[in-house]
Amino acid sequence: MDQEPVGGVERGEAVAASGAAAAAAFGESAGQMSNERGFENVELGVIGKKKKVPRRVIHFVSGETMEEYSTDEDEVDGLEKKDVLPTVDPTKLTWGPYLWFYMLRAATSTLSVCDFLGEKIASVLGISTPKYQYAIDEYYRMKKEEEEEEEENRMSEEAEKQYQQNKLQTDSIVQTDQPETVISSSFVNVNFEMEGDSEVIMESKQNPVSVPP
């Protein structure tokens, strides 16, 4: 009688342990799935928003520009160099390195300010324009003048052709109208001559000439 409760307790503990193990396994699998989904979402968001910035912009004499982008190797090298360079705490330096550190910082800041101001002054004075810009402008100006001259010549030729065609048309119209006027005048003259002859004949009939015996 005493062995049956002990066996029931052991069975209950075994069932509880198996249930806890199953719940733990299910929780781990669910956590892994959620982590994977979250990682995928984050990766897609980063890919969609990532924009590559050019490392430097090269300006040519002709006025054209070319953007140079860094490769993956350059980015890795830059990260390694940043990791290698140690951070300096000026408060922990002695007097010599402390003064040297601030002298270098002042020199670099002064050079950067001079570079910025020099670039602005050069752009205001027009020094930053390309070396042969005047030759390029002159070439485009001459090309524009040639195109305008060709356009004027073409328009004058078209106007002259149109004038010649109109002149030929008017001449042909005059030539077709002129024979009709000549024919009508000839008819008038003939009729006039016929009428004159009839009048002479009538007068001769009315006034007979007396013949001497």
UniProtKB/Swiss-Prot annotation:
Residues 136-173 form a coiled coil. The keyword Coiled coil applies. Keywords: Acetylation, Coiled coil, Phosphoprotein. The modification Phosphoserine is found at residue 70. Residues 162-175 have a biased composition (Polar residues). Residues 147-175 are annotated as: Disordered. The modification Phosphothreonine is found at residue 71. The modification N-acetylmethionine is found at residue 1. Belongs to the FAM177 family. This is Protein FAM177A1. The gene is FAM177A1.
